[in-house]
Amino acid sequence: MQMPKTLRIRNGEKVKSTFSAQEYANRHAKLRAHLAAENIDAAVFTSYHNINYYSDFLYCSFGRPYALVVTQDDVISISANIDGGQPWRRTVGTDNIVYTDWQRDNYFVAIQQALPRARRIGIEHDHLNLQNRDKLAARYPDAELVDVAAACMRMRMIKSAEEHEMIRHGARVADIGGAAIVEALRDQVPEYEVALHATQAMVRAIAETFDNVELMDTWTWFQSGINTDGAHNPVTTRKVNKGDILSLNCFPMIAGYYTALERTLFLDHCSDDHLRMWQANVEVHEAGLKLIKPGMRCSDIAKELNEIFLKHDLLQYRTFGYGHSFGTLSHYYGREAGLELREDIDTVLEPGMVVSMEPMIMLPEGRPGAGGYREHDILIVNENGAENITKFPYGPERNIIRK
């Protein structure tokens, strides 16, 4: 029996898209204008973020590749048979082609069905691995493969009004997660119990806000003591002690859109040495909030904030840049690296951009005030300055939690 290489699975009805039809039409139009200007026949996206951004389909890879083929006429998602009809139900576009596991490299067969011929194909240099790039090139021996990832990132950096609304919801849900952390916090509670409580609260809040939403990827990092030394350190079984430095990190994920709340906390009391470090980091945070406005250069913001840390002899303990862009991204996809508050980024802030202000310093064990300190707010840049959409309190006056 000859089994098929590809399928169409039209199972059920199309679901309500995350954004309006006009929103996706605007995204497609901007992309197509870029393709036309660069004489690119089609874009073959492979990343979570661009496939989600242009089609509203956020795939679950599990080791399989996915794609979105965009031409001047079509938007076609390429998905694996294991997903059934879900990719078709979600895709905002003209078609969905399913590839099967019956033969090797049916993925590329599906791409060729979506794009029979092309002279110039846009790919994502920062995502498509070398093996699959070579296989794609072999399917189109006369085509030139060129990068579109950087240009698409620049398009994503300016958020629409609908995206702003989504990010506002995310910031609100993150604040709910933060409140749940404080609620669960007590002496000798394990980190994972606090994190579980916060994640459950956020997932429920997302479900209450959005109809027919896919609930995936929302998470919490709650770190205590030495575990605060890395911003992305995993949750552990460590138990919280009175006087511990604590790091609250809540990340609601809504339709692939990321938001975050991050705060330094202490349980019961805070030593004088810790308080000095904390207050210095808060000083930088507050200064940074005032610098987020149109016309400011990312590198200039970083340099100005460096001076405050220098004043406190703490610059050597800074661990990363002062903030980054938001949008369709997560801890495993979508970093908009062109919009980060770092010394090596000269991007100028514009209305519509969404950035965080999140200074962090880390003093190693054995030093007075040891631990990692971080405050994180989200700001929407507008014509007159920026709107801070994070409402959860920060600093020693509010976040020494006494129970």
UniProtKB/Swiss-Prot annotation:
Keywords, sorted A to Z: Hydrolase
Active site, UniProt feature: H232
Pfam families: Creatinase_N, Peptidase_M24
Superkingdom of the source species: Bacteria
A molecular function (GO) term: creatinase activity
Enzyme class: hydrolase
Annotated protein name in UniProt: Creatinase
